[in-house]
């Protein structure tokens, strides 16, 4: 996106790889420099944008000397992370926050509720209008397709083994968990689909199903579990799942994680996605919040009629892709305004 906007983006890395063999092809063309290289050969810097982990304070100071702005972009559910980490992982430490010299805080649209928290944590005075801290969400299929070398596409069911419903939530927090999708499938199964002989694949499901609580208080009361329809898999990336289950239907559920790019990936490839993303309610098969009954109804609509809706579905996915495209002039203008503190 920044290249398309006329900037020369540089990816700051700890050390350069000895060869490019282990570097994804789409990253090979990226400008990469270490902190030492940047300091040895000063460049005109408009902004240093930190994403995820914090940057070496020495580089921050150097960028400030060059007249650049320091922006911290949070793309995670930071308040929840800061609360849950000491509770569930007391021995864990990572440099999520290094409080020094930051000029501005940006957050992704679905984490706008954390903008004020992030500002005060970083000793940055938030604007009176917190929406000025929202960085436009951008997405491009190049990441999914590995720079357009692979083109996964959904195929209608042609054999019994194609009849699969996948739950991809990683089950690592309350935000991304398989419980609501399982309950929606259970509701659908009880409501006239007991003859269904397909499979429910729960990716990374062992984190839930191996617990005593699930085994003793939940699984015994789910007919889809009692009838042997639920199978757990190790955690997998979305492209591998698409290849293994090219005719799958996906059940999704998130809390405070509305712009989950997995939803975009599934719809772009034509896979039926039953999701609860309010901002994309007009796309795919959507339900609201934890509404299990509505999720089950949307599952039935997707299961029974997706093939007939496929072309319209893909057209809508293209509209959504352009809405969030890094090449969309509206997104580029909004990002440029953030960089230069306009508006």
Mark where each language-model region is:
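N-terminal pre-catalytic "stem/leader" segment of glycosyltransferase-like enzymes
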Residues: 1-60, 164-208, 307, 326-329, ...
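Extended catalytic core of nucleotide-activated donor transferases of GT-like folds
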Residues: 1-104, 110-116, 232-238
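Hydrophobic transmembrane helix bundles of membrane-integrated enzymes that assemble
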Residues: 2, 86-89, 98, 158-159, ...
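Conserved catalytic-core segment of nucleotide-activated headgroup transferases in glycan assembly
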Residues: 5, 114, 118, 122-232
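Short acidic-hydrophobic, aromatic-tinged amphipathic segments that line or gate anion-handling sites
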Residues: 28-38, 227-234, 286-294, 301
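Donor nucleotide-activated moiety binding/catalytic core segment of transferases
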Residues: 35-38, 205-269
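A short, active-site helix/loop in glycosyltransferases that binds the activated sugar's phosphate group
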Residues: 83-84, 88-152, 326-337
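Catalytic binding pocket for nucleotide-activated donors in carbohydrate/polymer assembly enzymes
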Residues: 246-324
């Amino acid at each position: 996106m920044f290249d398309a906007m006329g900037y020369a983006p540089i990816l700051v890395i700890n050390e350069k790889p000895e060869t490019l063999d282990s570097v994804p092809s789409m990253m090979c063309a990226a400008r990469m420099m270490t902190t030492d290289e940047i300091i040895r050969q000063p460049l005109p810097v408009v902004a240093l944008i930190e994403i995820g982990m914090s940057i070496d304070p020495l580089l921050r100071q150097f960028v400030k000397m060059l007249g650049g702005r320091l922006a911290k972009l949070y793309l995670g559910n930071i308040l929840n992370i800061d609360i849950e980490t000491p509770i569930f992982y007391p021995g864990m430490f990572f440099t999520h926050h290094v409080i020094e010299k930051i000029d501005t805080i940006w957050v992704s649209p679905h984490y706008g509720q954390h903008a004020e928290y992030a500002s005060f944590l970083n000793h940055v005075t938030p604007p009176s209008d917190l929406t000025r801290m929202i960085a436009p969400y951008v997405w491009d299929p190049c990441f999914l397709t590995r720079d357009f070398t692979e083109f996964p596409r959904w195929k209608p069911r042609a054999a019994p083994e194609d009849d699969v419903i996948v739950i991809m939530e990683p089950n690592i927090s309350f935000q991304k968990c398989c419980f609501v999708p399982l309950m929606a499938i259970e509701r659908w199964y009880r409501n006239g689909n007991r003859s269904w002989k397909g499979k429910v694949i729960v990716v990374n499901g062992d984190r839930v199903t191996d617990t005593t609580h699930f085994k003793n208080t939940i699984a015994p009361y789910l007919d889809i579990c009692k009838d042997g329809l639920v199978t757990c898999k190790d955690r997998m990336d979305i492209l591998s799942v698409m290849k293994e289950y090219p005719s799958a239907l996906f059940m999704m559920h998130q809390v405070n994680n509305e712009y989950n790019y997995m939803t975009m990936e599934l719809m772009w490839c034509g896979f039926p996605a039953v999701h609860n993303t309010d901002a994309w309610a007009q796309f795919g098969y959507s339900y609201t919040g934890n509404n299990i009954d509505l999720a089950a109804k949307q599952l039935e609509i997707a299961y029974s009629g997706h093939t007939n809706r496929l072309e319209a579905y893909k057209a809508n996915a293209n509209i959504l892709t352009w809405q969030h495209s890094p090449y969309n002039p509206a997104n580029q203008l909004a990002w440029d305004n953030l960089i230069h503190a306009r508006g």
